[in-house]
């Protein structure tokens, strides 16, 4: 977190603002006692794997999987309530500065929360199989699941959306 804090702020601001340090310390007061540290670091590890060509190339070679040409598995910017976490931002899990955009950490985690919070991120469809193989290999197949959502649209909604996309007035 400390390294990420400097990576995010030193170049942009010349130093790490005290507000950022205070925010991270406040988040630690919830994360550590509630034992969410390992969970957040597991998500960081998955992100780190996807964004580190050497790790991707080595894993793919060991598993006999064709790696991406540049060794990077594209990820989304991180979505949902995790965007309110400065810790997640400094770890590179999310790409939106929660202080700059006025996002609340309490939406992500608070002392009353019992269940693990959602940290939504999207792995490129083209290379998702590599990410899933890494997670299963590292954390165990029994702990890996995929969720898919199917949406249906009415005829009227489809026509409306197509016309709107084509800039046809109502």
Range-by-range predicted roles:
Residues 1-170:
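Alpha-helical scaffold/interaction cores of sigma-54-like transcription cofactors
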């Amino acid at each position: 977190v400390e390294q990420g804090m400097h990576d995010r702020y030193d170049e942009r601001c010349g130093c790490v603002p005290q507000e950022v340090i205070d925010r991270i310390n406040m988040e630690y007061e919830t994360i550590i006692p509630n034992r969410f540290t390992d969970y957040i670091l597991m998500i960081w590890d998955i992100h780190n794997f996807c964004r580190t060509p050497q790790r991707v190339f080595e894993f793919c070679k060991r598993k006999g999987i064709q790696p991406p040409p540049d060794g990077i598995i594209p990820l989304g910017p991180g979505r949902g309530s995790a965007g309110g976490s400065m810790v997640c931002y400094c770890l590179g899990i999310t790409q939106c500065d929660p202080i700059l955009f006025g996002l609340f950490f309490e939406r992500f985690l608070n002392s009353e929360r019992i269940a693990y919070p959602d940290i939504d991120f999207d792995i490129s469809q083209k290379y998702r199989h590599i990410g899933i193989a890494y997670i299963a290999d590292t954390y165990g197949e029994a702990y890996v699941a995929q969720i898919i959502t199917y949406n249906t649209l009415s005829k009227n909604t489809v026509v409306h959306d197509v016309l709107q996309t084509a800039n046809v007035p109502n």
